[in-house]
Amino acid sequence: MPTSFVSALAQVRPDDYESAIGAAHRRFGWTAVIIMGVVGLWGLVLAVMRREPGRYYAVGATVASIALLVQVGMGLWVYVNDDAEWAGNQHVFYGIVILFTFSFAYIYRSKLAQRAALSYGLLGLFLMGLGIRGIQNFGQSFGG
């Protein structure tokens, strides 16, 4: 039986070393990455079919973007407020790269809109890849 996001969030139990926000960040990281990947693939399918993204795609892209930005926000909050050095600076680095990617997508939004399905599909897959790298590098740091 599927559970709602709110009931799933209520089940999050933090460990001794992290806050509830940290536990939510850890638990829902893959959810945000998968949603972004699905929307990215959806955009590529639309591009191959030579169709413009419609309202449903815009809603999906918005949900995926919000999910990923909430993840980054929770991660930064945990890093600043919980002194989460255990996360490793590579994990934090990829969160910051995700923020920069969203910033550049906003700056170049008029250029991206010229071939919207292809551009936003590739952007979604790129962001998914950054999220995967961030998860894979959890606990690792640059240098020694």
Predicted segments with their positions:
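Cytoplasmic-side transmembrane-helix entry/capping segments in multi-pass membrane proteins
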Residues: Y56-A64, R115-G124
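Structural signature of hydrophobic alpha-helical transmembrane segments
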Residues: R27-I34, A84-V97
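Juxtamembrane boundary at the C-terminal end of a transmembrane helix
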Residues: G129-G144
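Short, strongly hydrophobic alpha-helical membrane anchors
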Residues: M1-A24, S141-G144
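A generic, lipid-embedded transmembrane alpha helix
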Residues: A64-V78
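Loop-to-helix transition at the N-terminal end of transmembrane alpha-helices
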Residues: M49-L68, N89-Q90
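N-terminal signal-anchor/start-transfer transmembrane helix
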Residues: V33-M49
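Membrane-helix boundary connector in multi-pass membrane proteins
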Residues: D83-W86, S103-Y120, Q136
